[in-house]
Every structure is written in structure tokens, then in C-alpha cells.
Amino acid sequence: MNSSYHVSVCTARFQRKNRGSAPVRLGPYGIIEKTVKKRGPALKENKKPGRLWLLALYPASFALTALARADAGFAEWYAAGGPYTALSRTVNRLTSLTPFSVAEAAVCAFLAAAVFFALRFAVRMVRRKGRRAATAGRFLLNLACLAGVLLFLFTLACGINYSRYPFARTCGLKVQPSSKAELTALCRSLADDADRQRAGLKTDAHSVMELGTDFPQTARTAQKALDALEADYPFLRSGYGAPKPVFFSRALSRCNVTGMFFPFTFEANVNTDVPDYTIPATMCHELTHLRGYMREEEANFVSYLACRKSGSRAFRYSGDMLAFVYASNALYSADAGAADAVLAGLSVGVRRDLAAGSAYWRQFAGPVADVSESVNDRYLKANRQSEGVKSYGRMVDLLLALQRKEKTP
């Protein structure tokens, strides 16, 4: 048989037999050789970049925060008319497409995922006896990468905004030390306003104020009230959705939380289990956070302004009650007798609402509420609200400044 013909036949048979496998070639002297792929270099060429680059989000977050704290003008630009407005409006419009709180669903999903991955990690640590160090290292790396992403998103969503110009400076209010007489006059004025608004409101079977409107309608009123402020305060941008109800509101009450701005979905979430007279002011408070004002005392003050400007009597009453509680607490610290005298002059309806509110929160007193307050206190201090939870009382300085401005001819 011709040798070349023999090699060709053998080659054809070999290729049919090894169809789908690595290609073959004729080597020297017609010897059939199988091409072997070199895996090392190929893997290196196709290797996808790992997740280590996510760790760079830590220094990026710290750098942005440091820049904002060093230059309030940068923070004001970012929050008022810069990237924050575009980012928050875009995400808020998407999350506003659903009637439920996307934030609440995300938190529930996150907790479920955390439990799942924690259990999976524990199982792998038991099974991989010889590779426990590598398994633990990979788990911790993934955890660090996730935390870096969340920190960076938090920085963009609200962290920078904590360092913007104070609201008093932006709106032209002069905050200064006030006398006890001024504080007493403020409390009496707010008490009169609350009495006047309370007279025409609906009440429940226990003669306690009730809204008389469902949540969607109340939420739309809050949205319009905040939007209306843009005419007087252009830096309070409109164009955001309405607040969302929290399904597990009772759980929030156990943590002493009436509402929550969730920075990862740009939603204003409201506890619906609380006394009705607090809900409108809470809605406006959380919507203020959504508009870039993160300091609590400023969000309270803007909430008061929005409620007062609202055409709803229930909203005006809620705003008056919010302001009165803080002002009367400040007066009580300065002069308990004067505070008692103001409280004694309140109408029966207002006193009944205040008593109902106190009774509601009293049932949640305990370790959970204490821990929640402690966590909130540390969070506020970490974001340069040095007085922590006590900084809520600084709203009174803004109220006094507004009172002086309105009395000036």
C-alpha cells in the first residue's frame, strides 16, 4: 500500500473517531499529533477582573466626605443644584411607580439574604475542613466589598448633604440667643394656633383628633405642601413623589421611629400606626430629607413651614403641635412654672391629643426603644450633629428666629 495513502486514511479515521475533540495535525514524517491547548496562558487572558476594585470605594467615600466637611460650598452645590438633585429625582420617580415602600421590601430581602448567606457560610466552614481559611477569607472579602458599595451609595445619597450650608443661612434667618420672655411668647403663640386649628377637626370615638382622609390623599397633600415651598425657598426643589406607608409600622413604633428617609431608594417612609395628629408633620419631615436637608432640626422646621403653608387644617394643626412640643420642652427646661402655665391654657381637645400621644409611646418603653435611641444618637453624632438626639431641640432657635423676622416691620 502506498505510504502516503495509508497516512491519509489513518488521518481521516482518527478525525472521525475524535470528532469534537482537540484538532489534529500531521507532524514530522507523517506522524499524527494531537494539538494540546496550553491552559495556563489562556486562562490568564480570559480571566475577568475580580471584585477587589470595589474596595476603592472606601477611600472614594472618605474623600468625598472630607471634601464636603472642609468646603460647605461644595456640599451646598452638590445638594441644591448639582448631582444630588438629578440622582434623587431619577431614582425617586422610579420607586414612586409602586404604591408600596420599595425600601421596606429591600430591607426584608436584605435580612433574608443575610440569614441565607450566613447559614451557607457556616455549612461551608463545617464541610471544608482543609480550606476553612480560604473560605473565611473569601466570605469576609465579599462582605467588605458589599459594605464599600453601600457606604459609597450612602455618601452620594445623603452623606455629603449633612455638610451643606445651614438652612438659616440659606433662607436668611438670623439665629441668636433668645430670652426666656421670647421663648414664652413663642409657646403661647403656638398654643393659640394649635387651639384654633383643633376646633374644626374630626375626632374619633375617644374625642381624639383623626385625619378623616386615607393615606394616599394625605400623602398627596404633603407632597403639594412641600412643592409649594419652592416659591419662597427655591433651594427646596419640587418634582418628588409622595411619601410611602410602612407595612410593619408597629415594628417602627417599638424602635421609637415615626418615619424614615431611605437613601438607597430615595423614598420618604412613614409610620402609620402613630397618633393621627403627628402623621402630616412626619410626612413633611421625611420629604424634607428627600430634598437634601438631612439635619433633623432643619427637617422639623421645614416640616412646620410646609404644614403652616398647607391649605389643610389637619396639616396646620400637626405642624403647630410639632413646633409646640419642642418649644414647650425648651421652656420647661428654662422655667417649669412658665411651661406649666402655658400647658394649662391649652384647649381640652389639644390636651387630650397630647395625652393620647404620651399614652401611645409609653407602651413601647423598654430595651428595644432604648437601643434604637442609642443607635440613632450615634448615627447623628457620626454625621456632625454633635448634640446627638438632643439636637432635635435646636429647632426652637429657628422658630424664634422666624418669630423675630415676622414681627420686624
Protein language model features and the residues they cover:
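Membrane-embedded alpha-helical segments of integral membrane proteins
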Residues: 61-124
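Active-site recognition of the HExxH zinc-binding catalytic motif
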Residues: 99, 279-293, 297-300, 304
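Auxiliary, metal-adjacent structural segments of Zn-dependent hydrolase domains
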Residues: 202-272, 276
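Pan-zinc metallopeptidase signature
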Residues: 349-409
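Transmembrane alpha-helices and immediately adjacent membrane-cytoplasm interface residues
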Residues: 115-116, 134-168
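Membrane-interface segments at or immediately adjacent to transmembrane helices
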Residues: 159-228
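Short, positively charged and aromatic/hydrophobic N-terminal segments
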Residues: 5-8, 17, 25-34
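Post-HExxH zinc-binding segment in Zn-dependent metallohydrolases
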Residues: 294-339
